[in-house]
């Protein structure tokens, strides 16, 4: 069980409802500090959060997840002045724009990877940190394909691949930073957006999404925090229809186990070979 009490949490996101609702739940967990790096400033939301737990310190920065990594470092240098250290980094920025592939990939995947690369030295127990947890909030269409949101699905598949790779014991045993992902099912706020299919053939299906059954952002947020509290390095969760389900991971490449064992073997063992 991962106890959030007294933890310093950094949440990188857009202005979507899941991020705000997740922060509301986090504020009930007696966290010490909350750093919010959002694409749009929302003073009313910050006031709502502060009212939940006045003793928790909240800091806010307007943050563009698609910025260059050197610019990100300047932001996180400021974050560290206020936070001292980061226990939990949550990556939640997301964009579904099938007509703008570059922005979709840069927001959902490239920006998330650059953020992780920027923040990891501050969390790495062999560098500036004391270990911690990275949580990548992604989508169920990163596990199964979406014929209508092809670019969005591809970016979310990338998040899963990056998460599983970064969670490898090769890193975790040295830096002490666990990495996990939560795949959210459709929420009402998502389907209410003006969405366009990758190809026009799929638009009728996109339009039907508006009346499809889906979960509330509030329920989804509660399950994201529940997954964090059950954190184990490398785990992937599904938060959908009000439920939280652990994904059963599988190796498809028949050489994968042999390659991983070779990578983790000692240099002495390799010399003997």
Swiss-Prot record:
Q: Which residues form a coiled coil?
A: none
Asked if Oxidoreductase is a keyword of the record, the answer is yes
Q: GO CC terms for this protein? A: cytoplasm
Question: In this record, what's one Pfam family?
Answer: adh_short
Q: Which residues form the signal peptide?
A: none
Residues noted as binding NAD(+) in the record, renumbered to the chain? 11-34
Q: Which UniProt keywords apply?
A: Oxidoreductase
The residues that hold substrate are: 139
Which PROSITE patterns does its entry note? ADH_SHORT
Entry similarity comment: Belongs to the short-chain dehydrogenases/reductases (SDR) family.
Protein's name in the database: Alcohol dehydrogenase-related 31 kDa protein
Q: Which organism is it from?
A: Drosophila immigrans (Fruit fly)
């Amino acid at each position: 069980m991962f106890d959030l009490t007294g933890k310093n949490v950094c949440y990188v996101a857009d202005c979507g409802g899941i991020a705000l609702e997740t922060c509301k739940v986090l504020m009930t967990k007696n966290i010490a500090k909350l750093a919010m790096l959002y694409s749009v400033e929302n003073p009313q939301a910050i006031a709502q959060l502060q009212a939940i737990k006045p003793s928790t310190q909240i800091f806010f920065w307007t943050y563009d997840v698609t910025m260059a990594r050197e610019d990100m470092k300047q932001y996180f240098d400021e974050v560290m002045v206020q936070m001292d250290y980061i226990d939990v980094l949550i990556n939640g920025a997301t964009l579904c724009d099938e007509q703008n592939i570059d922005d979709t990939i840069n927001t959902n995947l490239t920006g998330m990877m650059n953020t992780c690369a920027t923040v990891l030295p501050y969390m790495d127990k062999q560098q500036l940190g004391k270990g911690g947890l990275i949580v990548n909030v992604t989508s169920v269409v990163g596990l199964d394909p979406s014929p209508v949101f092809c670019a969005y699905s591809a970016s979310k598949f990338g998040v899963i691949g990056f998460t599983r790779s970064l969670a490898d014991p090769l890193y975790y045993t040295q830096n002490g930073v666990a990495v996990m992902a939560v795949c959210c099912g459709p929420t009402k706020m998502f389907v209410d957006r003006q969405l366009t299919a990758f190809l026009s053939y799929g638009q009728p299906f996109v339009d039907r999404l508006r009346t499809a059954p889906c979960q509330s952002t509030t329920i989804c947020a509660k399950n994201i925090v529940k997954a964090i509290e059950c954190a184990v390095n490398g785990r992937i969760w599904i938060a959908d229809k009000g439920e939280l389900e652990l994904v059963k991971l599988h190796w498809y490449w028949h050489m994968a186990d042999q390659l991983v064992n070779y990578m983790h073997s000692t240099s002495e063992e390799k010399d003997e070979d």
